[in-house]
């Protein structure tokens, strides 16, 4: 944790105690609803806003995560997966192409290939 007034780190969490240091490959770090989500080759690690480890979502092959309302979402193995942040309930939508990642809004779904963007109406 960083104290902005003192401009100094007040709490540190050593990740090598949690992550497999042989496969340590952080791809993304996001804060959402007072939690910190670290996307790594080993999965999605969830920490509270003080850096305390909470849980791990065992997903691999994911390059990007994002959030919509109370769900975390990501593209994996040809599907768009949603995980409820509070109940851990999962749902998936099969995608028509092998998209790399996607963005979800209230009314649109944006899906990305290496050289193409497709978007769909979304409800």
Locate the predicted segments by residue:
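Short C-terminal domain-edge/linker segments immediately following a structured domain
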Residues: 67-70, 75-77, 88, 103-105, ...
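Hydrophobic, glycine-enriched assembly/anchoring segments
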Residues: 101-123
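Residue-level signal for tight coil/turn positions that link beta-strands
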Residues: 33, 41-42, 69, 77-78, ...
């Amino acid at each position: 944790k960083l104290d902005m007034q003192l401009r100094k780190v007040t709490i540190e969490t050593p990740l090598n105690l949690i992550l497999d240091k042989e496969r340590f490959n952080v791809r993304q770090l996001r804060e959402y609803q007072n939690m910190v989500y670290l996307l790594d080759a080993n999965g999605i690690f969830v920490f509270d806003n003080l850096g305390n480890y909470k849980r791990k979502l065992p997903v691999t092959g994911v390059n990007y995560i994002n959030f919509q309302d109370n769900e975390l979402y990501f593209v994996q193995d040809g599907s768009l997966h949603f995980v409820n942040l509070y109940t851990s309930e999962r749902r998936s939508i099969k995608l028509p192409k092998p998209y790399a990642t996607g963005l979800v809004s209230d009314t649109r779904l944006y899906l990305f290939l290496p050289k193409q963007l497709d978007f769909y109406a979304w409800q």
